[in-house]
Amino acid sequence: MAKDIVEPETSIHESISYDDSIPILVQKITNENMMTLSNTVKLLSMDALEKAVDLIINADKIEFFGVGASGYTALDAKYKFLRLGLKVDANLDAHIQAISAVNLGERDVAVGISFSGSTKDTVETCRLAKNSGAKVICITNYARSPITSVADIVLLTAAKETPLRSGALTSKIAQLHLLDILYTAVAIKMRDKALQGLNKTAKAVLDKLY
């Protein structure tokens, strides 16, 4: 499969030509990103989203897993959910991710983020988490991919990219948008507890500002 998706790049961006002016370039990229968000929402299963929200709210601990560009998406998710006062972690090192996964239990949740759904480190880390008893949520662009076979809940994005270019911005925009929806839904359902967490964490960094 890896050989099939690795093809020589023939352009900097699929929809942009070398003759495009800056204003046209701006409009094309903006339209593409807006289309990505719209298509992701159309693809999103409300039932899967509600189940993911309930799992996260009731979890003792949540671990976000991802490598490469998706690893930084996982770190962003960690920051968001920490603000709510939840026990959350994410790490860029694949070995530490594996160790964290085997230490999860039945009341914990693992969230695997992989645009292609075929990233070996992320898939295997999610498999370790599942074998340890944790529930697994995956965020991916491909419904038929290895990561969905180990996930209890699948949340799909709709970025128009090849797996080779999973570091491009449209895939990250889709992932961040989906995580923002998930975060907000969790916060609303937590109600006062979420507000307490937000106020507590805001005070913790208040003296970091001039």
Question: Where are each of the predicted segments found?
Answer:
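HTH-adjacent hinge/linker in prokaryotic transcriptional regulators
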Residues: M1-D47
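A ubiquitous structural signal for well-ordered alpha-helices
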Residues: N33-T36, T40, A52-L55, T125
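Glycine-rich phosphate/diphosphate-binding loops that line cofactor/substrate pockets in enzymes
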Residues: D47-A59
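Glycine-rich phosphate-binding loops that contact phosphosugars or nucleotide phosphates
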Residues: I57-H177, I181-R191
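A short, charged, Gly/Pro-tolerant segment at domain boundaries
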Residues: D192-Y210
